[in-house]
Amino acid sequence: MRALVVSIWVFINLVFFGMCGYMYLLWSQYWMYIEKDTETTTNTYDQQIYYYNRGYPMNETLFRIQNNTESKSRIKHAAKDAANITIIRNSKPRFPNVQGSDFPIDTDRYVCMKNDTAKACDNKTQQYKERLLKELKRVFLDESNVLKPGQENYYNVVYKGPKENYMEKTPKQILCELKNVELTTLKRSDIKHDLYGLRSYIPKRDLFENNKFNSCAIISSAGSSTKSSNGKLIDSYNLVLRFNNAPTKGFENDVGKRTTLRILNSQVMSKDEFKFLNSKMFRNITILAWDPTNYTASLEDWLAHPEFNLFPNYIEYRKNFPRAKIYIVNPRTIWKVWDYLQRNAPNRLRRNPPSSGFVGLVFLLSHCDFVDFFEYVPSVRITKRCHYYEPEDNASCTFGVWHPLSAEKLLTYYVNVASDSDVFQTGFVRVPGFNKLQC
């Protein structure tokens, strides 16, 4: 009798576990089908954002996606062939949950109106601040998920240092650590093997060596600059930094008209559509160009195989304008900035270089009494528009696409000394320069 009961009990358990296993197989097959069904759309979206965030106009972006999706071998050989572009494949959108998020975008709900009382304005500002910081933290945690697709390590990043929580340190400690980060431009003495005849055109000194400025402004290209009316304020700074091909003409009321320095990614310098050699936008200013390299590559490796070959146009520009001030970031030191970000983040960062914005901030902090960064931490005018000068929408540009943007912005706000009204209503964070620090 006991044997019969045991047999029935074993049989029932086998049936139960068998049914569970069968249901699991059905469920997993269903999700595999969904993954395959959405893979094409996802990859197109991801590549669109990759190209767009690296400097291509949207119409050129879509053209390049269509012409590259069948060319898988380009990824494998991208590091060896400067004409090839590393395409982000088999990965999720960089901000996959933005549409499902309850974070308000393109609304004037939190904008302080003329008839608002001071208390009402403060309440709006605090409500927006809480929601924005919560959203940035959510994106940061989402991006650090090691099981999440899209965690490719294209630059072979091997980080072995600590991962600390920046909030357990004081803002002064964070800035003192940043002060010790070596971020430099290429100098003539750095180049030992001159492959392109480049050496004689490289400056002998570092960018802004021995130069100091009182007030510095960095103008992001964010769509939230629209209707800010910050133009006159921006033009009042001693130094004004802009990015890539962001225009001022027609947008002076919001972003000003003065430009002292432009940071250009290597695509803007190397691709014909940006007219680097002919556009007046790139004349009579200081230019700082950058191009990423492998995390462990030597300078000689990068000079031989840049991601995008900016050197021919760099040399031609120097020939055309011998007195021009044009510099190139030492690509090895860009990863020192990434190491700094990872060291102050308890979770793993996306293993791509930091953004041009954060690189620009680090550069200027060594030369400015303070740096005001406009619309880096997005104000109440936050919008899905990527850029103030183009109509295309994509909220991913604000919260993180290819660079570890959410981590950068959280850290920058943590060391900010501007009031919440300045940050979230006017639209700038203020970071004190290194010369004001007592480390």
Regions from the PLM with identified roles:
Residues 2-439:
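Metal-ion/cofactor- or nucleotide/acyl-coenzyme-handling active-site neighborhoods
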